[in-house]
Amino acid sequence: TGQRLGDISNMKFSDIWDDHLHIVQEKTGSKIAIPLSLKLNAINWSLRDVVARCRDYAVSPYLIHFFRATSMAERGAQVKSNTITMNFSKARDKAEINWGVGTPATFHEQRSLSERLYKEQGIDTRILLGHKNQNQTDRYHDDRGKNWTTVRISQQ
């Protein structure tokens, strides 16, 4: 859904009602209700599909939780933001992607990718990302330098 890391970490099953995931965004205080039917065509998953995958055999109020006990947390405990970031980086590094001269992707860059993909689908990404104005959202419309900007010249 392109939500911020802290908001993802804080999501609870109790935030779901009326077929929407309700989020009060940490950073801005924006209140958004995202339909569970929201689908990202690029991966063919809806928010409902993601929520269903969060339900497992560990009882937890949190969507993102530990499914087994570790030395750091009990089963069902909330996974904090720094743990999500650290494990994203570990998974990214295990993928052994050649980033060339660029820097490896960060967890936060998924927010930018989500913005671009949902915008292609016609979703109002300013509202989805919880921004007050379009300029904030436009900063997320970055493809890591993959596309070229063509200079247009007038015909004389």
Each language-model region and where it sits:
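Conserved beta-strand positions that form and line the central face of beta-propeller blades
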Residues: 22, 63, 106-109, 139
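Catalytic-site neighborhood detector that most strongly recognizes the C-terminal catalytic loop/helix
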Residues: 25-29, 129-155
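N-terminal/domain-start segments enriched in small and hydrophobic, helix-friendly residues
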Residues: 82-95, 142-156
